[in-house]
Each structure stands twice: as structure tokens, then as C-alpha cells.
Amino acid sequence: HLKGALALKKDHRKAVTLGQGKTLGMLFFNPSLRTRLSTQKAGRLLGMEVVVMNFGSEGWQLEFGDGVVMDGGKAEHIKEAAAVLSQYCDVIAVRSFAELKNQAQDQADIVLNGFLKYAGVPIVNMESAAGHPLQALADAMTIEEHKKRAQPKIVLTWAPHPRALPQAVPNSFVEMMQLMGGPTAIAHPKGYALNPELTRGIPIYHNQEEALEDADFVYVKNWSASDPYGAVLNTDPSWMVNLDKLGSAQMMHCLPVRRNVVVADDVLDSAQSLVLHQANNRTYSALYVLHQILQH
């Protein structure tokens, strides 16, 4: 997929008619900047009509449970909603964050899987409770374009944040690290372990400096605790990434980033920051996924 995405980025002009007469429906249960605009742009580059709905504020509240007596606040069941949307759209893209209340429920990805189960058209994940694959593909493209050796060392490090954030981005980045090969490491304080099925085989450090040793790429990201799930256990500013810690490595972050909390100004304003390259590649990761769907 990585080679295909990079090739399409270089030469996508020929694909401008592939999506003609097709409609991409984008449903947002949560806020978005990069995902929303890059996926819209990708659809348009393929000639698709793009319709966007902020489902959280504009749609009916959806029920996802089977056999529920719907006498509460939820007005429509996913069965009807997904079936109706499938009549209007040839591809449906969905963004729905983790609620960070119940780990098993978030890992079950109820909203995304509800659409997968009841829609009659392909579904694109624009960040779900458990993962953000469009971001991970853009990240892989960015690493491939900027690596200085065949098997660079890739490190994922936790950094502090005042709010509880989902584990979706780190989950997908870890899956991508496993596929890239080469040396890897993950650094986080105690209590912040990611899904052990995803991190299997990757060295885990509670000492950030040790993990960052000889790193080529440092991916900085906050996520909330695993035990107790969804909590903010630690806001230790010494975990913030600055140029001293980064050394000669290149820094990555999915954005939005809180300056001087997660990453210092001196890093974000330096040539070692790849965040704008990552954001640019968001268009091309979405383009590749939509291109694959339209071709098949």
C-alpha cells in the first residue's frame, strides 16, 4: 500500500475521472480539520461529489444496540440510518472518537462497526474509537520520503496534555511501526500501556531518554491512561519533547499539537519537524484509499 500511495501522489492527474458520478458521504460525530479537508480534497481530485454532515450536531442521535426499546433520547437506529445513507452515497466515511469511559466498548468500535454491518457500500475510517489508519498511512509515507537509511529507528513517545485523549492515533501508528520493520521503541509513564496485542515485540521504556537513543524518527503523542482507563494520571512537563532530547532525529506529530506542552517551539519551528509534511500526506493517503475503493 505504501508504494501504491507514493506512486499515486506523484501521478494522480489520470485518476481525475475515476469518481465521476459517484458520491462520497462524510459523517462527523467529532471535530476535524485535517481529516475533513484532506478527505474532501481527495474525493474531489478523483472527480467525486462530496457531501459532509456533522452528525453529532445535525443528525438524529443514533442507537447502535440490537433489540433496544427506543424510548429514550435516541431517535434513529443504525439499521435505518446506514441503509438510507447507502442509497445516497457510493462510499461513506465516518469519524467517531472513543468515549474513554469503557475500554472494551471503545475497542469494539461500535459506531464504525455499526456502519460496516448495516451499510451496503464501502466504509472509510476517518478515525474511530480504536484506530486512525488514514493518519498511519500518511505517517508511513512521510517516513519513507524522509528516511536517511534503509531501516530507521522509529520511536513513539508519550507526552503530557491537560485533557484525556484517545489511543486511536498511537494504536494505528504502532501497527504501522510493526509493518515498517527496523528498530522500534515506545516510551510512556507507568499506567499508559497501549493494547498489548498491538505492541507485542516492541521494547517499552518508562525512561524517555533511553528510548530516544539513536532515534531517526520520534513520533510524539499524548494518550490517556489504560489503568484506570481514560484517566489523566500524569502531566509531568519533563516528558515534553524539545530539541535537546530530539538530538538529530526528525519529529512527527499528527496535529493539532499544544506548543510548549507536548512539543517545544524550538522543535516545531525547526527543519526537524515533519508535521506539515504529514498533514500534506493526509490528502494522498485518503486519495489512495478512495482510489482503491473506486477501482474495485
What does each of the following model-derived ranges do?
Residues 198-273:
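Rossmann-like adenosine-cofactor binding region
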Residues 119-121, 182, 244-250:
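A short helix->loop->beta-strand "cap" motif at the edges of active sites that frequently abuts
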Residues 269-296:
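C-terminal helix-to-coil terminal segments
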